[in-house]
Swiss-Prot record:
It comes from Salmonella paratyphi A (strain AKU_12601). Binds 1 zinc ion. Belongs to the SprT family. Its cofactor is Zn(2+). The active site is at E79. The gene is sprT. GO terms for cellular component: cytoplasm. Zn(2+) binds at H78, H82. This is Protein SprT.
Length: 165
């Protein structure tokens, strides 16, 4: 899938949110953390990722276009918080108590670990598997692990191993 071009107004709204959250954090923490690099290269089902060493936030342009308001309100501060925690506390658990505190107490945003966006447009091919009670769809990665004998996946309901087909 080709990466969509983001309208400049959306990019500006993302940058505005990033700068507002960063200014708020700098004020509350009495620090002067720099503005991270922001790129729109995240692919797959992740809404975004924070790259600590390069001090960079990568956002998924497809999910952003499909969920503009919620994405800007939740994903941008979520990823910024990872960078702020790293700068403020050093390397910590990705969604640990420091991250939760930074999200809720410093930025005033609910600390959610995962997004709830529809993923049909970004999901890759899946492979049908079944157990005794239902049909399942495994990702390419999981399917390949089964084929190579590296993994056996089980149904969370009946506990039976999943079988291709």
């Amino acid at each position: 899938m080709k990466t969509p071009r983001l309208p400049i107004a959306i990019q500006q709204a993302v940058m505005r949110r990033l700068r507002e959250n960063l200014a708020q954090a700098n004020l509350k923490l009495d620090r002067h953390y720099p503005e991270p690099k922001l790129v729109y290269t995240q692919r797959g089902t992740s809404a975004g990722t924070a790259w600590l060493e390069s001090y960079e936030i990568r956002l998924n342009p497809v999910l952003l276009l499909e969920n503009i308001d919620t994405f800007i309100a939740e994903v941008v501060p979520h990823e910024l918080t990872h960078l702020l925690v790293w700068k403020h506390f050093g390397r910590k658990a990705p969604h640990g108590k420091e991250w939760k505190w930074m999200m809720e107490s410093v930025l005033g945003v609910p600390a959610r670990r995962t997004h709830q966006f529809a993923l049909q447009s970004v999901r890759r091919n899946t492979f049908p598997y079944h157990c005794q009670c239902q049909q399942h769809q495994l990702t390419v990665r999981r399917h390949n692990r089964v084929v190579r004998g590296e993994a056996v996946y089980r149904c969370v309901h009946c506990g039976e191993p999943l079988v291709a087909g």
